[in-house]
């Protein structure tokens, strides 16, 4: 083998630089997924909010016709009421309906999200742009919820009633 190949092997043979993932109880991650569903026989291309607790791997989901601020707030409110509390820290993507990325790299929360956050008393943490792996637990939960609850597309009469059912699953 050539000099470069030998040096690469030397340099990289014992490369065990990893940070262990340790999650503290009470931290949660939030993300949306896409799913089709039938309400009163009408097909909708909707979205489902996912909240997962990495420490315990428990997750909750709520289905909506949109992926806007109102859906985020309603879904989180439903989940908080169901679990009887609020996580002390929530991890989010940099969704434009809750945060603006400023030129200097800082973030500015939207007024409505700031009020929602203050009302429920949680700390909001935002992932770095293009770093979905920073909240990998909820990314996995998005797939789990889709495979187990939303495929084939569910059929129901009232979305609100189906969301109550989803909280009990």
Please give the residue ranges for each predicted region.
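Acidic/histidine-rich, metal-coordinating catalytic segments
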Residues: 85-105
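Charged alpha-helix within mobile-element recombinases
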Residues: 121-169
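Secondary-structure transition/capping motifs at alpha-helix termini
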Residues: 54, 79-88, 119-122
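Active-site beta-loop-alpha junctions of metal-dependent nucleic acid enzymes
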Residues: 62-86
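Two-metal-ion acidic nuclease core segments, chiefly of the RNase H-like superfamily
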Residues: 106-124
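An acidic- and aromatic-residue-enriched active-site/binding cleft used to recognize and process polar
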Residues: 33, 54-56, 64-67, 92-97, ...
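Short small-residue beta-strand/loop micro-motif enriched in glycine and branched aliphatics
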Residues: 57-62, 151
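Mobile-element integrase/transposase regions
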Residues: 5-59, 67-74
């Amino acid at each position: 083998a050539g000099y470069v190949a030998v040096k690469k092997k030397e340099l990289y043979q014992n490369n065990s630089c990893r940070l262990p993932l340790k999650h503290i109880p009470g931290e949660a991650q939030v993300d949306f997924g896409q799913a089709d569903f039938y309400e009163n026989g009408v097909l909708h291309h909707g979205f489902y909010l996912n909240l997962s607790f990495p420490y315990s791997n428990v997750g909750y989901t709520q289905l909506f016709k949109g992926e806007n601020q109102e859906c985020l707030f309603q879904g989180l409110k439903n989940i908080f009421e169901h679990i009887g509390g609020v996580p002390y820290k929530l991890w989010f993507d940099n969704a434009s309906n809750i945060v603006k990325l400023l030129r200097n790299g800082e973030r500015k929360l939207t007024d409505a999200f700031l009020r929602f956050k203050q009302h429920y008393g949680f700390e909001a943490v935002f992932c770095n742009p293009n770093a979905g792996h920073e909240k990998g637990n909820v990314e996995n939960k998005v797939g789990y919820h889709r495979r187990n609850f939303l495929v084939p597309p569910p059929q129901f009469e009232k979305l609100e009633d189906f969301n109550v059912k989803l909280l009990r699953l």
